[in-house]
């Protein structure tokens, strides 16, 4: 039986094996999707095993979505433009084995937003984070037509690189460690969309019971919102994070909320098709 791996750390909380294996079984594909925790310094060894083993491919999650790119023999042009890979296809031919990297996270973010038929009023967005998920979220914002993105993050050096990714988008950077609460709240109040793209709040992470947005900031920002706002949480375990709970508590009746589980399902369906060349039965 062939294998498909989920590589990352932490990954004990992942729901991907449940729906990926359900799809494989439904279509009678002889393959099993399983988690493979990769500790610091182990990535090279794991990728060597992937090349030599009976592996169809893999999903890549925190913290390897950018560093995995160095291991690829080929990267899909779209993934290159995003700057992150979350899906690997193992191509085995007479000439040898090649690892091809793709990004399905962007589709996983765009599709749930489009499905909401949400109308943009200001074309402004707030993006929290600068990691691989944030890179995908930024590309999704570009594709959706946002003209201004406020990036709020601790890694200011990484945040500065976002401005070079799309000249058509005005990017302003704010240090999460030093931004005044009133300033942070005003960014939220003016935004059409706020995306939480850090691992903060994740069940098996280092900070499972907190939000990157202080509660008073969330309250002030959402109660003073200038129009409808869509709040997108990319963390899916727990299903309702502290960030999402506060957003629901203080958002007005026109606010829209998207849970991370929706992104997981949509990006997972795209990955499934890359590995199997068949559409996932779950969507």
Regions found by a protein language model. Give the residues of each.
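Phosphate/diphosphate ligand-binding glycine-rich loop within oxidoreductases
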Residues: 2-118
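Rossmann-like NAD(P)-binding element
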Residues: 181-213, 223-227
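Short acidic active-site motifs
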Residues: 42-46, 179-184
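Rossmann-fold NAD(P)-binding glycine/threonine-rich loop
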Residues: 90, 208-282
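Glycine-rich adenosine-cofactor-binding loop
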Residues: 8, 103-106, 113-146, 153-156
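Short glycine-/small-residue-rich Rossmann-like dinucleotide-binding loops
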Residues: 63, 196-200, 235-236
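NAD(P)-binding Rossmann-fold cofactor-contacting core
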Residues: 146-169
